[in-house]
Amino acid sequence: MNKFAIVLAAGKGTRMKSALPKVLHQVAGKSMLAHVLKSVSEVEIAKNVVIVGHEADRVIATLPKGTQFVKQVEQLGTGHAVRIAADLLANEEGATLVIAGDTPLITGETLGALFDYHFAQKATATILTAIAPNPTGYGRIIRDEKGSVEKIVEQKDANDFEKSITEINTGTYIFDNKSLFKALTEITTDNAQGEYYLTDVIEIFKKAGQTIAAHILDDFDESLGVNDRVALSQAEGTMRKRINHEHMVNGVTLIDPATTYIDSEVTIGAETVIEANVTIKGNTFIGKNVLITNGSRIENSEIHSNCEVRNSTVEESRMSVGSNVGPYAHLRPGTVLSEEVHVGNFVEIKGSTLGKGTKAGHLTYIGNATVGEKVNFGAGTITANFDGKNKFNTEIDDFAFIGSNSTIIAPLHIGKNALTAAGSVVTEDVPDEAVEIGRGKQVNKLGRAKKMPHYRGQ
């Protein structure tokens, strides 16, 4: 049987107190809507329709290519939101999943089990329910004396007895598609909110003698709907625990999972060790047997096997096998370290490629440079690559030795096996195997110090 999906992403999210549409707030580096769409994609959906409304264009811009969407111009309730998908889905034969775009913790495994249960029960509607420790704010599942689902009552419409019920509606359903769209033509706004409730179709089905099933979630956390920043932080914490657990099961050592923040799209190889207070974000790849020490931050980068990142920041950069950085180094966007490169204390590199075995041990800035193999940078080396308007490139060939406190005024080229003397200001190309000395001659003026303000006498 064909499977369809409707993802509800039209709400403003007033309680978020944000200019950003609620479904675009991020959990573990990815929008809540993106998490939901990923889970939906795991159950072989034939047609997926996203309902957009508030800030529709911003939401549409984030959708995967080819995703169908419908704009809900007026937010008149969940029933209305589903009904406006009729032109795309009403005539289809099959089962339709309806899910909110602010439920980032729901898994593809759960959705697959929900479809299986729906088909096994031969139901017209199947509700994903959960037993809530505190059901306040949720719609309650009302069952008859035989235990069958009778209806769903929203919090604002519930009486005291109904409010005491702990089985709640998670807001995720599967319906027989044609039955759903027929029932949606019968719902009204006769309720406390003055809205078209999707949940009213359950009562319509029940009165028609159709089968209503309820599948109870094993993990209540999956049902979390995010309506404010408190719930957003709860979702973030739960997702982080889930992500960290998966990495540890796959052979990654996390010294302190409670202070380790790893985004959902990060890949990490076995035998890697990650110390406390580490943040790894975006589409980052980390290979096998990597050490990442306390306080490091890595974002959208590739760190290949046997590398070390010690108390450092790596952004949009690539570290090849066996290279190491830190402590307190900063690889800025566009940096590429070849194999066995060493970048040490207080070194900043941007938009540069360093060849195999090159070393920049301390207190160095390398920007817009192409550096060969086994080049040595002395402490205090600066590539002066910016004149206030334009950036300029520096080329340094294999085996060059850059003396301490050298200032390299780009654009220029330093040849193979060349050497710059310590303290040089390099303003011209340096040929292969040449020694460059670009500093003023030292002059000692004997006795002159006695006339200087610092002088303290014998």
Swiss-Prot record:
Sequence intervals crossing the membrane: none
Reactions mediated catalytically: alpha-D-glucosamine 1-phosphate + acetyl-CoA = N-acetyl-alpha-D-glucosamine 1-phosphate + CoA + H(+); N-acetyl-alpha-D-glucosamine 1-phosphate + UTP + H(+) = UDP-N-acetyl-alpha-D-glucosamine + diphosphate
Function, in words: Catalyzes the last two sequential reactions in the de novo biosynthetic pathway for UDP-N-acetylglucosamine (UDP-GlcNAc). The C-terminal domain catalyzes the transfer of acetyl group from acetyl coenzyme A to glucosamine-1-phosphate (GlcN-1-P) to produce N-acetylglucosamine-1-phosphate (GlcNAc-1-P), which is converted into UDP-GlcNAc by the transfer of uridine 5-monophosphate (from uridine 5-triphosphate), a reaction catalyzed by the N-terminal domain.
Binding-site residues for Mg(2+), renumbered to this chain: 102, 227
GO cellular component, one term: cytoplasm
CC cofactor: Mg(2+)
Region (N-acetyltransferase): 251-458
One GO MF term attached to the UniProt entry: magnesium ion binding
Cofactor binding: number and manner: Binds 1 Mg(2+) ion per subunit.
Record's protein name: Bifunctional protein GlmU
EC class name: transferase
Region described as Linker: 230-250
SUPFAM superfamilies reported for this sequence: Nucleotide-diphospho-sugar transferases, Trimeric LpxA-like enzymes
Annotated EC: 2.7.7.23, 2.3.1.157
Natural source organism: Lactococcus lactis subsp. cremoris (strain SK11)
